[in-house]
Design a protein with these regions (language model features):
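Conserved alpha/beta-domain cores
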Residues: 1-173, 179-181, 193-195
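Gly/Pro- and small hydrophobic-enriched strand-loop and loop-to-helix capping segments
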Residues: 183-200
Length: 200
């Protein structure tokens, strides 16, 4: 599945994207995502909204107000905050565990045993649903090497949680490598809409 990011786009462009058949939309800034989601609803568009940016725990309640999927869960503390915020939703919030492929603590993403702790916590929650994993290939890595490593982590996760089959990996610059190694969702907003501008 392809997923469009609308971070760069005007309201008219976003309406056109939805009218053109895009069913999943990704956003990485909470302060921009909520008004975009509200505008889409007012225009009669109902895409699935994916939050893909780094998320602070104090924004959990805001995000669950519009997001169908949060792809950037990289700590037990954030998963716990989302679990509390999502209590009472009509349907569980889908969560992807953001994986750090290179283990660099300066980047977003869980590494080592934290991946499995987060996965187990989400899978045990009534308010959350474990969908799978999300990752960004490190810029200095060969994309095939990065996504091959992610595929190994995904295989291990699915062996424990068979429902966690979503692999959100690959962007406009490396989507071919991601697909070769099992990506089910690619993030191609830049290809569709161009580079980021401010919200209009």
């Amino acid at each position: 599945m392809r997923k469009s990011g609308t971070s760069t786009s005007s309201k008219s462009t976003r309406r056109g994207v939805c009218a053109g058949g895009v069913t999943d939309v990704g956003e990485n800034r909470d302060q921009e995502a909520e008004p975009k989601a509200a505008a889409a609803r007012a225009a009669g568009a109902t895409p699935r909204w994916h939050f893909i940016g780094q998320l602070q725990r104090n924004k959990a309640k805001s995000v669950i107000g519009y997001a169908d999927v949060v792809e950037s869960v990289d700590s037990v503390r954030l998963a716990t905050a989302l679990d509390r915020a999502a209590a009472g939703r009509p349907a569980p919030l889908e969560v992807l565990v953001q994986v750090s492929i290179d283990g660099d603590p300066e980047r977003g993403g869980a590494a080592g045993d934290d991946i499995w702790r987060i996965s187990d916590l989400v899978a045990s929650s009534a308010a959350l649903r474990l969908g799978g994993v999300m990752a960004v290939a490190p810029q200095e890595w060969d994309p095939d090497r990065a996504f091959e490593q992610l595929a190994g982590l995904t295989e291990r996760l699915v062996s424990t949680h068979p429902e966690a089959t979503t692999v959100s990996a690959g962007m406009s610059s490396d989507l071919e490598a991601a697909i070769r190694h099992g990506a089910t969702h690619v993030r191609i907003g830049t290809s569709l809409l161009g580079m980021r501008n401010t919200l209009r």
